[in-house]
A protein has these predicted regions:
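Amphipathic alpha-helical coiled-coil segments
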Residues: 38-50, 114, 118-137, 148, ...
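Membrane-embedded hairpin module used as a gating/binding unit in multi-pass transport
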Residues: 194, 209-213, 236-253, 257-263
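Short, charged, amphipathic alpha-helical segments
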Residues: 101, 164-172, 303, 369-377
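Bacterial Sec-pathway N-terminal export signals of envelope proteins
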Residues: 18-60, 86-87, 95, 161-165, ...
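Bacterial Sec-dependent N-terminal signal peptides
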Residues: 1-33, 393, 400, 404
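Outer-membrane beta-barrel "beta-signal"
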Residues: 80-84, 283-293, 388-392, 399
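Periplasmic alpha-helical coiled-coil/stalk elements that build and connect Gram-negative outer-membrane
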Residues: 3, 117-231, 330-333, 337, ...
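Small/polar (Gly/Ser/Thr/Ala-rich) solvent-exposed segments
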Residues: 37, 59-76, 86-113, 253-283, ...
Length: 405
């Protein structure tokens, strides 16, 4: 087993160290991940809507030609030109902008959530790769140790202190461990493919992992209060705010729209007549109001907004309960991983002592190779469980980091 560093440090979850190689992988993943890019594009699309809602209604132009020219005192009317512009009630455009801004803020939280999830997935995959590689190294060292025992057994066979069966048992054990190394090799390739998929690159791109990981013996106290600023919950707050802005916009849309216009009528001169207004064109400024008399649509919208807010509060509570449960589980699982690591470290020390006793027996002229195999198997079991404890410790720390920062 490679050197496992046991160092008393305080693991600040807000500055959890992933190791330089993992940090580089995370940087690559954040730059290339299509899901993050999708949410960023959606966010930009909502922001662009602000330019759309800034616009006022289209200006109306009209032209009319009198097929039968009506006679007036000043002459016959020939054609009519008109222009009209409706303007929303005061504050309506601002209300639309505020609504779009609130929607954009909610969309932005999707980016933060996607980034957190990607970091967590990359980290967990990385620690799985570390575990597989570390197990392979442990098995290789155990095989080397078994080969040493095999040589000892062959020497004992020559002196009549061991049988050929002992040698065969050791060789069978070596074959079993070599088979496990091969299986782990395929598992590593599978996990490497998963990592490269998360990084949006070719599946056979080689991943390098750390040779050792630091395991902490003390941790910060983490509670449910740490969840308050989690983007999965902030998203509900911002969606709630967007519904509030939607209702303010709904109230503005119940107000009348003001219209300003101008009519121009071309008038022909009356023949054989002379007076000051003969043929004088008509110019008529106009003001109009568009009033939503039937407001059932807006009343329904108000009720819908209220129900939507209630739904969001329930959704937030459900998600908060789930995240709280996840955090509590991760905290306790991490503590359990540390306990398991310490226990297996003690067991390894005992197994090493037993192994030394057996080796001294060999020096004195006798050794029980069945006991050797038993001790070797025990040591391998403790080493494997210790690696699993390290993996669990870091994976649970990743979950805590995802939830509490």
């Amino acid at each position: 087993m490679r050197k496992i560093i046991i160092h008393v440090i305080i693991l600040f979850i807000s500055t959890f160290s992933y190791g330089q190689r993992l940090e580089n992988l995370i940087k690559i993943g954040l730059e290339n991940n299509p899901e993050i890019q999708k949410f960023e594009t959606a966010y930009k699309g909502v922001l662009e809507k602000k330019n759309e809602v800034d616009a006022i209604p289209n200006t109306q132009f009209g032209f009319g030609y009198f097929a039968s020219e009506p006679e007036t005192r000043t002459g016959a009317q020939r054609f009519k030109l008109s222009v009209k512009q409706m303007i929303p009630w005061f504050g309506s455009i601002t209300a639309r902008q505020n609504y779009i801004s609130s929607m954009a803020e909610a969309k932005f939280e999707n980016i933060a959530i996607a980034k957190r999830r990607l970091i967590a997935s990359l980290s967990q995959t990385y620690y799985n790769l570390f575990t597989i590689k570390e197990k392979q190294e442990i098995l290789k060292k155990n095989i080397a140790l078994l080969k040493t025992y095999e040589k000892m057994a062959l020497t004992s066979v020559e002196t009549g202190k061991a049988s050929a069966v002992d040698v065969l048992k050791l060789q069978i054990r070596e074959n079993d461990l070599e088979q496990l190394i091969e299986v782990l090799g395929h598992q590593f390739l599978s996990m490497q493919t998963k990592m490269n998929t998360l990084l949006s690159r070719k599946k056979d791109f080689k991943i390098e992992v750390l040779d050792s990981l630091v395991i902490s013996s003390s941790f910060d106290t983490i509670g449910a209060d740490n969840l308050s600023l989690h983007p999965e919950l902030l998203k509900y707050d911002k969606l709630y705010k967007s519904v509030e802005q939607s209702e303010l916009l709904n109230q503005k849309e119940q107000k009348p729209m003001i219209g300003f216009g101008l009519d121009y009528v071309a008038v022909s001169e009356r023949p054989n007549m002379s007076f000051s207004d003969n043929g004088k064109d008509i110019v008529m400024p106009m003001v109009s109001l568009s009033i939503p008399i039937f407001s059932k649509k807006h009343s329904s919208k108000t009720k819908q907004n209220k129900l939507k807010q209630e739904e969001l509060l329930f959704d937030k509570q459900i998600r908060q309960n789930k995240l709280t449960s996840m955090l509590d589980t991760a905290i306790n699982e991490r503590i359990a991983a540390k306990i398991s690591f310490d226990t297996h470290m003690k067991n390894l020390e005992k197994a090493d002592s037993a192994e030394q006793i057996l080796l001294k027996s060999y020096e004195s002229g006798s050794i029980n190779f069945n006991d050797v195999l038993d001790i070797q198997e025990l040591k391998l079991k403790f080493q494997m469980k210790q690696i699993e404890a390290i993996k669990s410790f870091y994976i649970q720390s990743t979950i805590i980091n995802y939830l509490s920062n």
